[in-house]
């Protein structure tokens, strides 16, 4: 995405947020609120997320109680909500790139502080479900250990103090606007990884805004670079989706000259939430036709300004007929780049064909080619 020209000093340590940055807390919170609010005849539709992301638990609870006009006090809400949340804590998944990032920093001896608006006990509980994470953090700071939570700089200043580092030498990684504000107020450099879609315009004060942790380039900040990119692609933990092919927007073949095979988003809503927007690749299987190389986009397609997040796979084969209704199986094995907007249709088409070339070449490599024989593709 973007990087400001204000970068002056390199970094010697990292201060990183937890909820929404390393783990998908928002997904579990949303599920609980959706059920909880029903008993009051209210409906959680996610629009309040922007108001509570990055806030302390008390601030978030106050917002919900007031905005939904709940017939209870904030402490009563919390006494009911937190047992429900604690029972679901083991279901909070790490976000793509999180495990890779913190283990890489640990391996290279980079001091890392976990600095969150959650309480210290809450932080400890959350990371206990992620094996080996606690050992990756030199310091852990919760909002109950300082005078004020984010957007106050207190949490990051305390983290830098415990690491015995000047804040100017620290790199903050944050998903929320309050977190970015806190990092800048503390005098650190800040990378924003927005956790809410289509909200990047709110993060202009950050030194850099990236799409996901998969896109972080540590060498920009004087930190040890990742060495796991292969032929301009990043191997990822494979994930599987499938379903009958349906008709899409009708622009793949007609507008772009690129026939995509669309799947119903209702069948894999969880996968859409878990995986960041961008261009991926892998293998596609049609039981009656075989297995084919595939490149696909996940996201909002900003050029066309989609209203919903979609997955649009392009099977890299010339088919002589449509195959609507046939079962399509996908194994996604690698990542190419973040989602981007384009100034013209021609530049968009050119980039899609460039992605195709990258995917076709990469899928011949043994580390990716081995997935072609996965029985999931044709069963």
From Swiss-Prot:
Top-level taxon: Eukaryota
Keyword Repressor part of the UniProt annotation: no
Biological process, per Gene Ontology: FMN biosynthetic process; riboflavin biosynthetic process
Record field: temperature dependence: Optimum temperature is 55 degrees Celsius.
GO molecular function annotation: ATP binding; FMN adenylyltransferase activity; FMN hydrolase activity; magnesium ion binding; riboflavin kinase activity
Binding residue positions for Mg(2+): 17, 19, 260
Catalysed reactions listed for this entry: riboflavin + ATP = FMN + ADP + H(+); FMN + H2O = riboflavin + phosphate
List of catalytic residues: 17, 19, 312
Binding site for FMN: 337, 342
pH dependence statement: Optimum pH is acidic (5.5-6.0) for FMN phosphatase activity and basic for riboflavin kinase activity.
Alphabetical list of InterPro entries matching this protein: HAD-like_sf (IPR036412), HAD-SF_hydro_IA (IPR006439), HAD_2 (IPR041492), HAD_sf (IPR023214), PGP-like_dom2 (IPR023198), Riboflavin_kinase (IPR023468), Riboflavin_kinase_bac/euk (IPR015865), Riboflavin_kinase_dom_sf (IPR023465)
Summary of subunit composition and partner proteins: Monomer.
Function summary: Bifunctional enzyme that catalyzes the hydrolysis of flavin-mononucleotide (FMN) to riboflavin (vitamin B2) and the phosphorylation of riboflavin to form (FMN) coenzyme.
Family: In the N-terminal section; belongs to the HAD-like hydrolase superfamily. CbbY/CbbZ/Gph/YieH family. In the C-terminal section; belongs to the flavokinase family.
Name the record gives this protein: Bifunctional riboflavin kinase/FMN phosphatase
Species this protein is from: Arabidopsis thaliana (Mouse-ear cress)
